[in-house]
């Protein structure tokens, strides 16, 4: 879901993948996996599956998209969520409810043969299971791509790594990374290409875009702390929907009038079970770890081929071709080329 602060962000720089060649990018793994689950589908919205009915849309996205990053000279570091904060339970419940409703509408659309509607609802109907997560970690490890296990929110950990300078930017479709302090956020990194507009036979080009935290703060005349307060007012994953009657523009006015969170939240009708100061403090000081390695490793090609082809029924010819490209990318990136870029 993420925080809805897009109205505050005007300075977006469109990127080509070549613009970030040589950079290490920390990706919100779950955000990327849900993008792949939504995008890699058959015409009726059904995800890719093995003959046993095991979903492989996410496997496909992780494998082929990550290989393309490496080919472009980009080192992706996938950051996986850890334990959710206790006050995120409502957001999780809401997602489960929305998935159940979408699944019902998907099946209804299939029954009447409305493939357009079926595909739309299918994108929201499926979940990332624990088995899919473990499979994706295995694929990345066999590719030699770094993975990081966050103690809590993946975006918080990615932002921490960016603030330390261990990665150049974070990557996610959500803006939460900015509230967690990421100096740079790249959106659309995992969905670059053409995307169909909802309900229309129209396709638009989607390119990565760079957002810099300092530019956002300077343009709006606020601090990061005030940005966090705006996020809480309009709604985060921890207080869905935000404070009634307050949109982004009104929130901006309020944080400029009441600069301390204690003053601000005492002036608005707060109707959530969670204390707003707890959310504020979580964004400022989330649990993170320094126990990670961002270096690219040599791919385990034989094991990767077996895992993709024998266990998950991918095309042997195509997988072999991509593995050869991964091996070449590793030689390029580990042979001194990366240091000259990063």
Curated annotation (Swiss-Prot):
Pfam family of the protein (one): XPG_N
Record-linked CDD domains: H3TH_FEN1-Arc (cd09903), PIN_FEN1 (cd09867)
Which SUPFAM superfamilies does the record match to this protein? 5' to 3' exonuclease, C-terminal subdomain, PIN domain-like
Q: How is the cofactor bound?
A: Binds 2 magnesium ions per subunit. They probably participate in the reaction catalyzed by the enzyme. May bind an additional third magnesium ion after substrate binding.
- As recorded in UniProt, its EC number(s) are 3.1.-.-
Region: I-domain; residue ranges are 117-259
Swiss-Prot/TrEMBL keywords:
DNA damage, DNA repair, DNA replication, Endonuclease, Exonuclease, Hydrolase, Magnesium, Metal-binding, Nuclease
Region N-domain: list its residue ranges: 1-99
Enzyme type, top EC level: hydrolase
Q: Which InterPro entries match?
A: 5-3_exonuclease_C_sf, Flap_endonuc, Flap_endonuc_arc, HhH2, PIN-like_dom_sf, XPG-I_dom, XPG/Rad2, XPG_CS
**Chain sites annotated for binding Mg(2+) 2:** 174, 176, 237
Family note: Belongs to the XPG/RAD2 endonuclease family. FEN1 subfamily.
Q: How does it assemble?
A: Interacts with PCNA. PCNA stimulates the nuclease activity without altering cleavage specificity.
- Which HAMAP family does the record cross-reference, listed alphabetically? Fen
Can you say what this protein is called? Flap endonuclease 1
């Amino acid at each position: 879901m993420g925080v809805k602060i897009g109205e505050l962000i005007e300075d977006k720089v469109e990127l080509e993948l070549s613009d970030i060649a040589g950079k290490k990018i920390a990706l919100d793994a779950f955000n990327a996996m849900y993008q792949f689950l939504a995008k890699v589908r058959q015409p009726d919205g059904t995800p890719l599956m093995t003959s046993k009915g095991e979903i492989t849309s996410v496997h496909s996205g992780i494998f082929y998209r990550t290989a393309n990053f490496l080919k472009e000279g980009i080192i992706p570091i996938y950051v996986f969520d850890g334990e959710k904060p206790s006050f995120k339970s409502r957001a999780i419940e809401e997602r489960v409810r929305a998935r159940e409703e979408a699944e019902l509408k998907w099946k209804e659309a299939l029954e009447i043969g409305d493939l357009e509607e079926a595909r739309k609802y299918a994108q929201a109907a499926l979940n990332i299971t624990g088995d899919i997560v473990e499979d994706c970690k295995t694929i990345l490890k066999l590719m030699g791509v770094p993975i990081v296990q966050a103690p809590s929110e993946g975006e918080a950990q990615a932002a921490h790594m960016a603030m330390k300078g261990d990665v150049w930017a974070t990557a996610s479709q959500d803006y939460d990374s900015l509230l967690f302090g990421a100096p740079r956020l790249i959106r659309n990194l995992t969905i670059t290409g053409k995307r169909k507009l909802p309900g229309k036979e129209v396709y638009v080009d989607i390119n990565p875009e760079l957002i810099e935290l300092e530019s956002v703060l300077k343009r709006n005349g606020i601090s990061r702390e005030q940005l966090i307060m705006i996020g809480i007012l309009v709604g985060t994953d921890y207080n869905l929907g935000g404070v009634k009657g307050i949109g982004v523009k009104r929130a901006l006015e309020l944080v400029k009038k009441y600069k301390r969170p204690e003053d601000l939240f005492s002036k608005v009708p707060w109707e959530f079970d969670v204390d707003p100061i707890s959310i504020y403090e979580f964004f400022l000081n989330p649990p993170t770890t320094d126990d990670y390695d961002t270096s690219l490793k040599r791919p385990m090609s034989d094991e990767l081929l077996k895992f993709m082809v024998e266990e998950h029924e991918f095309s042997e010819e195509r997988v072999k071709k991509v593995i050869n490209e991964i091996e070449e990318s590793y030689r390029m990136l580990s042979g001194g080329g990366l240091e000259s870029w990063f």
